[in-house]
A protein has these predicted regions:
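HAD-like aspartate-dependent phosphatase fold
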Residues: 2-111
Length: 111
C-alpha cells in the first residue's frame, strides 16, 4: 500500500490530498533497502483511482520510493497474496504485513 504505509494517509476527498502526503521516511528506507538488495520484487498496491497514476508516480519518484510495479484502483477491502511452494522450494515464500495506519516502523515488522 502507499497511503498510511509509505506516506501519511492522503485522499482525493479531503486534505492532505493525493500527492501531498508526508513521507514516512523510515518505512521508505526499509522498503528501498529490500529493493536495493534485490531480495524482493516491490509491487505497490493502492486504492487510489487510476486517474491519479501520473500524480502517484510523480509523488513516489519525488519521495525516493523505489518499486517494480504499481497496481492501482483496488477496492477498500482485504488484499490476498497467493503463492505456491514445492519440493524445489519447500518453504512458503509469501508473506504479508499488516500495520497500523501512519506507523513508521516497517523495519521492525520485517524482522
Amino acid at each position: 500500500d502507499i497511503d498510511g504505509t509509505l506516506v501519511k494517509n492522503s485522499s482525493h476527498h479531503f486534505p492532505p490530498y493525493i500527492g501531498s502526503g508526508e513521507p514516512l521516511k523510515d518505512n521508505i528506507a526499509a522498503l528501498n533497502e529490500l529493493y536495493d538488495n534485490g531480495k524482493a520484487r516491490i509491487i505497490l498496491t493502492t486504492s487510489r483511482p487510476e486517474r491519479y497514476r501520473q500524480t502517484t508516480c510523480w509523488e513516489l519518484e519525488r519521495k525516493g520510493i523505489r518499486f517494480d510495479q504499481l497496481v492501482m484502483g483496488l477496492p477498500h477491502s482485504q488484499r490476498i497474496l497467493i503463492n505456491d511452494f514445492a519440493k524445489s522450494n519447500p518453504y512458503p515464500s509469501a508473506a504479508a504485513i499488516n500495520m497500523p495506519r501512519n506507523k513508521n516502523d516497517l523495519k521492525e515488522l520485517l524482522r
